[in-house]
Regions:
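Periplasmic-binding protein-like
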Residues: 67, 145-152, 238-278, 297-313
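Ligand-binding clefts/hinges and TM-proximal coupling segments of bilobed small-molecule sensing domains
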Residues: 52-53, 99-102, 178-202, 276-313
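Acidic, polar ligand-binding/catalytic clefts
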Residues: 90, 102-168, 247-251
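Bacterial lipoprotein signal-peptidase II cleavage site
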Residues: 17-30
Length: 313
């Protein structure tokens, strides 16, 4: 009896154990499958998060500017980057959330060398357009202001000299200009347009600003081709280095020469984004607002109407 019962039980027991084994294997496989899927989902989510983070990462941009070209670019009493051009780029920065601008004050020489080498991404120094410079840097289509140029002359001649044309008729006896300077080219272009009354254009090496003013006061020359902010800062301002000449010298505006930010050649995407922002700021009147704040007048009104990058001035 016992032997027969045991023989009957053993096959049944083996069947049950086999079923448990199959069930356990199935459960383990299912668990493994779920875990693998969960791991894949987690990896995908992490990948998507990483991609999103990369796409939205803020790019830091180094904006170099000159240290003491007041009021265009300078370092204020608090040690902060300031000036008209810096203010324009701070306004641009607010419009471009994908970028964060860091301002670096430096010399004009280091600015150009560093910008070309990629040390800086943007350079601000009241730059005029030249074909030679455009070979090294990116100019946007939109300028951001101008350098107002004209002549400093003896106040005693104010009835006869009111602009560059009347000065040319008066004598045209101009303080010599370096032939490498953009001012030299401007007077050359003036003479082409006024062949009957040209200005005496004499090439010269660099000289001290005080010499130019003194030569005019002495009568050696009748005018000095100068930038208005330089005249205002050095002669008109009460703390100007040559304020003692303020009652003896006057200034007559010729025209506004557009100024531009420069971009490293590898930063075309940044240049395009900033160019679009400049156009919008100009349209909204923000540039005129900043001009009035830093200069007390419009730096746009004396730019020749219809001027485009590359036009003769």
């Amino acid at each position: 009896m016992k032997i027969r019962s045991l023989a009957a039980i053993i096959p049944a027991l083996l069947l049950v154990l086999g079923g448990c084994s199959n069930s356990s294997s199935s459960t383990t496989a299912a668990d493994t499958s779920v875990a693998a899927q969960s791991s894949a989902d987690s990896s995908m989510a992490a990948s998507e998060l990483e991609t999103g983070s990369s796409d939205s990462e803020v790019k830091k941009i180094k904006v170099a500017h000159t240290q003491s070209y007041y009021p265009y670019d300078f370092v204020n009493d608090k040690g902060e980057s300031d000036g008209y051009e810096v203010a324009v780029f701070k306004a641009i920065d607010e419009m471009l959330p994908e970028y964060e601008f860091e301002y670096v004050s430096t010399t004009a020489e280091d600015l150009l060398i560093g910008l070309e080498a990629g040390k800086y991404d943007v350079g601000l120094k009241g730059v005029w357009w030249t074909a030679e410079r455009e070979e090294k840097f990116i100019y946007p289509e939109n300028y951001i202001g101008s350098s107002v140029i004209g002549i400093a002359f003896r106040t005693e001649n104010a009835n006869e000299i009111t602009d560059l044309e009347s000065f040319a008729r008066y004598s045209g006896n101009l303080v010599p200009i370096s032939p490498q300077s953009a001012q030299y080219t401007i007077i050359e272009n003036f003479n082409k347009e006024h062949p009957d009354t040209p200005i005496k254009l004499t090439p010269a090496d660099q000289f001290e600003l005080s010499d130019a003013y003194q030569w005019v006061l002495e009568g050696r020359y009748d005018a000095f081709f100068n930038i208005k902010v330089s005249f205002d800062t050095n002669v008109v301002a009460e703390d100007g280095e040559y304020h003692q000449f303020a009652d003896k010298l006057s200034f007559a505006t010729y025209k506004g020469i557009p100024i531009w930010p420069l971009f490293n050649k590898e930063k075309s995407e940044l240049a395009t984004a900033c160019d679009d922002a400049i156009a919008k700021l100009k349209e909204e009147g923000k540039l005129e607002e900043l001009s009035d704040k830093y200069f007390g007048y419009s730096v746009f009104k004396d730019i020749p109407e219809g001027y485009k990058k590359g036009d003769d001035l």
